[in-house]
């Protein structure tokens, strides 16, 4: 996740707005890389306990309260426990790939944070630098690529385990990432068309005084896609406990399992930071009169963390309130709703952007159109009680009954009124708990109609 000076010099040469990164000495780049790494680890430890406490509150439970003040060190205790547990490798596993898969899953989560701006220019040990590890002329594309690399770790873990359930979980994960990566990419396209730049620092600077929350459909599209991207409820199909035991990490234990756990929560922090950067102004304060002065020095870092925590609460809120979707519903929603809406919205943003550039400022029209498309998207999501799906099931059942041959069926267990017909039921003996096994009477040969 570190950036070399040559990379920064190349980026500065490609884009004059990035010249500040080329002036950073190597020790400062290394210091910022270590700070980003430590920030992600601390946010992961916090998010684990925060989630357990919030879900416990929603379920009227106490939650963790043993380790540390009010239980806030519970995640440290869990990490120590996982590191001390026995590390088991299945006999049928492909050992090199089995060991490498958790690392492949965790590393891309750190990489994406390299281009996230935490704050404006500050002074660190006398050196003026931006609170951002690095920036590129194509930072948004870098974010999209880094976010999609983690799926390789999930696929390798399922394939190398030598077990059926992990393999099914990894296949689900691949299909899920492919489906929702397209919708996420369409949300990104609308943002950088509207902003006119692919640089994350340029996008944040363009939101001074107004956030890109006006791109309502892109924001809704991204919020749904980021939940699917991180395999969180209600889109946690690759690790569905009731169907696949533990999913792709069923055969993992000890520190390898901890790596998957770490990757999941760092991905949550990363996609939350991307949403903050692209739609909520990044480190910029809210566009409220009186707060415009709180956008210099180290104060913007607080705004950034607060927005990050709001998105983490959004993840936890979804987990505590929504059930898991069925696999066919999940894939149908991605391909039939999200992607078409994203394509229409990108076309609308591009049209208005060209019209705005060559005619006059039509931002109010763009905002109004965004609100309309956002309302249509929300209406498309609403299916009270699954009524449409229930109708489809009933119609399918009626078709089956209509196509089935008309035969007399013997109900099981037999109804009480049929007890006197034919031979009486015979008891085959009592079981260990005192119950008896009943052999039904022979109804005799069936007569064809």
Curated annotation (Swiss-Prot):
InterPro entries reported for this sequence: NADH_UbQ_OxRdtase_su1/FPO (IPR001694), NADH_UbQ_OxRdtase_su1_CS (IPR018086)
Biased composition (Low complexity): 418-436
Membrane topology recorded in Swiss-Prot or TrEMBL: Multi-pass membrane protein
Gene Ontology biological process: aerobic respiration
Entry GO MF terms: NADH dehydrogenase activity; oxidoreductase activity, acting on NAD(P)H, quinone or similar compound as acceptor; quinone binding
GO cellular component labels: plasma membrane
Top-rank taxon: Bacteria
E.C. designation(s): 7.1.1.-
Regions that span the bilayer: 29-49, 96-116, 136-156, 177-197, 211-231, 259-279, 298-318, 330-350, 365-385
Compositional bias ranges of the Basic and acidic residues kind: 393-402
PANTHER family: NADH DEHYDROGENASE SUBUNIT 1 (PTHR11432), NADH-UBIQUINONE OXIDOREDUCTASE CHAIN 1 (PTHR11432:SF3)
Subunit structure: NDH-1 is composed of 14 different subunits. Subunits NuoA, H, J, K, L, M, N constitute the membrane sector of the complex.
Family: Belongs to the complex I subunit 1 family.
Protein name: NADH-quinone oxidoreductase subunit H
Organism annotation: Frankia casuarinae (strain DSM 45818 / CECT 9043 / HFP020203 / CcI3)
Classification lineage: Bacteria, Bacillati, Actinomycetota, Actinomycetes, Frankiales
């Amino acid at each position: 996740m570190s950036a070399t000076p040559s990379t920064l010099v190349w980026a500065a040469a490609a884009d004059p707005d990035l010249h500040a990164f080329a002036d950073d000495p190597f020790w400062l780049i290394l210091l910022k890389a270590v700070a980003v790494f430590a920030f992600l680890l601390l946010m992961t430890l916090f998010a684990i306990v925060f989630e357990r406490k919030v879900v416990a509150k929603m379920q009227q439970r106490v939650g963790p309260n043993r380790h540390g003040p009010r239980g806030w060190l519970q995640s440290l205790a869990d990490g120590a426990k996982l590191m001390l547990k026995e590390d088991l490798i299945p006999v049928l596993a492909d050992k090199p790939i089995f060991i490498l898969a958790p690392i492949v899953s965790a590393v891309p989560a750190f990489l994406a944070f390299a281009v996230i701006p935490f704050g404006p220019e500050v002074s660190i040990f006398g050196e003026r630098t931006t609170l951002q590890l690095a920036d590129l002329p194509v930072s948004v594309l870098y974010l999209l690529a880094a976010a999609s690399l983690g799926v390789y770790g999930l696929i390798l873990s399922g394939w190398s385990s030598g077990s059926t359930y992990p393999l099914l979980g990894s296949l689900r994960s691949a299909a899920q990432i492919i489906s929702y990566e397209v919708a996420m990419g369409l949300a990104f396209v609308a943002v950088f068309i509207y902003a006119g730049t692919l640089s994350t620092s340029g996008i944040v600077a363009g939101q001074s005084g107004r956030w890109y929350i006006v791109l309502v459909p892109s924001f809704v599209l991204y919020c749904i896609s980021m939940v699917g991207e991180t395999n969180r409820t209600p889109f946690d199909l690759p690790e569905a406990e009731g169907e696949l035991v533990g999913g792709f990490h069923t055969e993992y234990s000890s520190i390898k399992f901890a790596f998957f756990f770490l990757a999941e929560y760092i991905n949550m922090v990363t996609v939350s930071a991307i949403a903050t950067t692209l739609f909520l102004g990044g480190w910029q304060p809210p566009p409220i009169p009186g707060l415009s002065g709180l956008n210099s020095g180290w104060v913007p870092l607080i705004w950034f963390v607060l927005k990050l925590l709001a998105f983490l609460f959004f993840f936890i809120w979804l987990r505590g309130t929504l059930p898991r979707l069925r696999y066919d519903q999940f894939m149908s929603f991605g391909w039939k709703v999200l992607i078409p809406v994203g394509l229409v919205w990108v076309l609308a943003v591009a049209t208005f952007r060209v019209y705005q550039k060559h005619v006059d400022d039509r931002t109010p029209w763009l905002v109004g159109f965004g609100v309309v498309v956002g309302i249509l998207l929300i209406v498309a999501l609403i299916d009270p009680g699954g009524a449409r799906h229930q109708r489809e099931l009933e119609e399918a059942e009626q078709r089956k009954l209509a196509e089935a041959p008309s035969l007399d069926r013997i109900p099981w267990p037999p109804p009480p009124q049929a007890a006197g017909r034919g031979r009486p039921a015979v008891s085959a003996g009592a079981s260990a708990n005192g119950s008896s096994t009943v052999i039904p009477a022979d109804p005799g040969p069936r007569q064809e109609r």
